[in-house]
Amino acid sequence: MAASLAPVRSHARTWITAASLFVVSCVVGLWVLHQTHRWPKGDGPHYAIMTSSLVNRGSFNVKPSYTSGDYIGIFSAEPLDYHVNAQYFSPDSPAWYTYHSFGLPLLLAPFLLAGEALHIPALYALQIGMVLLQALGVVLVYLYALQLIRQNGAALVAAITLLGSMSYLGLASSIYPDVLTATILVGSLLCLERLRRKPRSLLPMAILSALAGFAPYLHVKTGLMSVTLLALGLWHWWRNGRSRKALTPRGAGRGVEGGSSPLAQLACLLLPAGLLLAGYAVAIHAWYHTWVFTAPFSNGLLFHFPPGKSIIANLFDTSRGILPNNPGYLLILVGLPLWWQRDRRSALVALVVLLPSLLLQSTFADWAGGCAPAGGRYLMPFVFATLPAVAFLFAELRWAFRLLMMVPIAAGVIMGVHYTQLDFVCSYAGDLNPMLVDWLAMHHIRPDFAIPIFSHDLNLNGGLGTTLLLIGLGVALAMLLAGIVIAQRRSRSAMANSDDSQVGATALRG
């Protein structure tokens, strides 16, 4: 009886933890919202204007709002620059469509409608919507890590590492698509893992297809990620559904081993993504009169830099880098070798999905995310997808070392809370990290330690900037080396236990 109830208890614990984590994430997001200035930063007002245009005019045409200024006092305190691609629109064009993708306004439109019905200010309704959608991302990180590691506490630590980090808190409630893009990515990886354990399940395949099809709606640069995810789904279908048994009339009609048929699974993979991508292409053609749906949004920004260099900048720059601003993320580097050792297949899947998109992202001219919070918002999808490494590390260590893990996580929380409470105006690549400048001033430390390592043009600042980069590289390599040592010790321990078991079995037979 107890054994039969164990799966039920496990599922109940998972969903109770997920629901609790969602509530906590919403509370954190609302706290951040009440610490910050009223007006959204960076591209936020433009996404808000797009949402308002959709709800109030039934179109993404932003020309009436831009020209009339009806957004002033609602989404912005002052007039905005027109975020319109001049290659496609002129002042005399009857309609203007921005160079921002329209997926985020689509997701936020229901919250704006609900806000109008409940007499909630329009901007506040959109920000609450962002809090709820971003909280889903934290929950999916937990579920993805749990799917891989099968240890509730370890998966929860991975999610908390994200929730308390400065990069997440800096984006919480902000109207940027990066956390939602990361949510779609980690949700897709979760679907692939579910398919790995239930190869002929239809629901994970359909959700994977829908997520991959919707990703370009959030940002056109996710197109490569979508293609990779769909290719992995097709590879899974071919490997698990095209067996000789499945190709027989009986197998094709009823499926194999009680599962769904290969044709049904193929339909679940192709139809949602196909319909979404076709709708996206038709909309882009109607607005911009081109079937090259990347053209209106790239605006000459892609392939500006050679691949790779901006990855170093996004990792180690004192202002825009994710590692100096998020000590907890260093645990990812320690955990990666353990992930590779314990579950190489899932690690390879993540690598195949992430690496092409990361290299493409590294060619982007605006490498640091424009006017954005410190901490590298463009790398958030890659952070989400690699956070299970923290869970693998936690599961491997004993309690004393687990407590030691809490030090960088707690340091990240302190930095994130401090950054949020100071409510700095967003900054650009090459600008000083305002939080670091404030902290150095408080402790009477040389302010040039806050110098950005890289300029806006990705030039390395000499002198102290070079020294800081070398220190950062040294710390990162030390973290990776520590992970390799832990993984090797685990491997030797497993081999020793296996040898002892064989000796014991031989003695019993004797």
Regions found by a protein language model. Name each.
Residues 1-35, 39, 261-272, 471-510:
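Start-transfer (signal-anchor) and selected internal transmembrane alpha helices
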Residues 167-180, 321, 375:
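Short acidic/glycine- and proline-prone juxtamembrane loop motifs at membrane-interface regions
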Residues 149, 188-205, 215, 239-243, ...:
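Membrane-interface transmembrane helices that cradle and orient dolichyl/undecaprenyl
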